[in-house]
Amino acid sequence: MTRTPDDPRLELLQGTLDMLILRTLRWGPQHGHGIGQAIRRQSDELLRVETGSLYPALHRLVKRGWLKSEWGVSEANQRAKFYRLTPSGRAQLIREQDRWSQLVRAIGRIMNPAPTAEE
């Protein structure tokens, strides 16, 4: 999808998709399309996860043991694979949130430095 200069949507920072998926699944099991919709809704439509990024990430998280998947029926009465957090996925989410907080603080110190005598 081509973006225009006035498009308010934001690009996901590299490495944040896994964290967003894990956080979204803290609210409960969800199918892939629902995870993408939840990220979009919770970000006030600023973040959109493309299918080509979402499903490889889900498979990677299952392979790492952070998610479990099982087939079920969606709200549209369609067969869908539902994902849920595992205990190790919850632990990973805590680690990811801690790293994210550190990153935000570090960037904040650069973007909003304390005034110095030189300024």
Question: What is the role of each PLM region?
Answer:
Residues 10, 51, 79-82, 97, ...:
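Short, structured helix-loop boundary elements
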Residues 9-55:
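N-terminal helix-turn-helix DNA-binding core of bacterial DNA-binding proteins
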